[in-house]
């Protein structure tokens, strides 16, 4: 039986860590040192894809024998990227702008094994339609959840689900930050099968 390569999640996101833990695979977490500044003219999807690959590549360069997962998510409101708000005031602005509208969350993932010359990337879109939210609902949600580290200020895995009218996606965990269906397929191709004994 071949030895399973070391698995590394190139992310400091607790949401991605918690999602990857669902696969019951041993893995380490390494913080990727990547500049996440958007480039001029870069689309939200392009930004998510570039950052996912950059995160995986930064860690794979340090750990070439490991299989590395990099991921990034960018919310897209009519072609404008919406990132993590970082503050209450910015979160209020984001949710007011998004209420009653459809927002696409682009969740990109790259799996890379430098020693094995393996690299695959995919971007999973999740379309979310927000309710026509009242200002008092926005305030209550933000004071309760404090989602200032989430793209678009929406934590659908908790109370944020009450903000929504609908979610459309082929990979339900993509909205939380890591598309596990696609990630499993890429891991199998890289030699790590979550279902292998």
Locate each region found by the language model:
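Anionic-ligand binding patches
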Residues: 2-8, 42-197
């Amino acid at each position: 039986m071949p030895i399973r390569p070391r698995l590394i999640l190139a992310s400091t996101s607790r949401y991605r860590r918690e999602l990857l833990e669902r696969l019951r695979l041993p893995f380490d977490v390494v913080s990727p040192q990547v500049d996440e500044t958007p480039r001029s003219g870069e689309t939200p999807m392009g930004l998510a894809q570039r950052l996912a690959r950059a995160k995986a590549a930064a860690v794979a360069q340090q750990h070439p024998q490991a299989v590395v997962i990099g991921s990034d998510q960018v919310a897209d409101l009519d072609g404008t990227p919406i990132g993590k708000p970082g503050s209450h005031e910015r979160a209020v602005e984001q949710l007011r702008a998004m209420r009653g509208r459809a927002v696409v969350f682009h969740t990109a993932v790259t799996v890379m094994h430098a020693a094995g010359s393996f690299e695959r990337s995919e971007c999973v879109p999740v379309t979310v339609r927000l309710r026509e939210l009242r200002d008092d609902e926005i305030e209550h949600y933000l004071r309760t959840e404090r989602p200032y580290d989430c793209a678009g200020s929406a934590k659908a895995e908790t109370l944020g689900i009450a903000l929504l009218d609908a979610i459309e996606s082929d990979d339900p965990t993509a909205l939380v930050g890591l598309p596990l269906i696609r990630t499993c397929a890429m891991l199998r191709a890289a030699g790590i099968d979550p279902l292998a004994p």
